[in-house]
Amino acid sequence: MIRSDLPYPKTEQNGFTMFEVIIVVVVISIVAAFVVVRGTSKTVYDLASESEILKGHLRYAQYRAMSDTESWGLGLSANGYHLLKNKIAASDILPNESGPSHTLPSGITITAGAGTAVHFNERGSPVGDGDALLTAETEIVLSDGSATRTISITPETGFIP
């Protein structure tokens, strides 16, 4: 029942309050964010994470070489890599692995411009098979077929950005 003695008669209101509109917009934004994140290919995440894992393992081999008188490195194959000590397979365990090797997820491959292995000397510098310092940047490429991630190792210093 509408009271007529009010200066502005109260009428039935149709519509939404500003609070309701804001809540709906926030909920839709949150749902859209999850849909966009989940819609990205899994191999994109795998490629990024495998790139960081490989960098960590390269740094580990470099650290071991700097803590030892022998060279340390990683031997590369199309679907993974393994730890090397004095250019032969090592039995030491890679960080966060259960053994001296790491297998890449299916669909991701690895190639290196320097060949099938990356070695570091006691100064942490990348060296070739004959222990000569490398004069060019060493590049290791991880690929999932549509995207690539390149890891570069700086000559002489062994810096891995």
What are the residue ranges of the model-derived segments?
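N-terminal helix-rich module
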Residues: I2-Y8, F16-F19, V25, I30-R59, ...
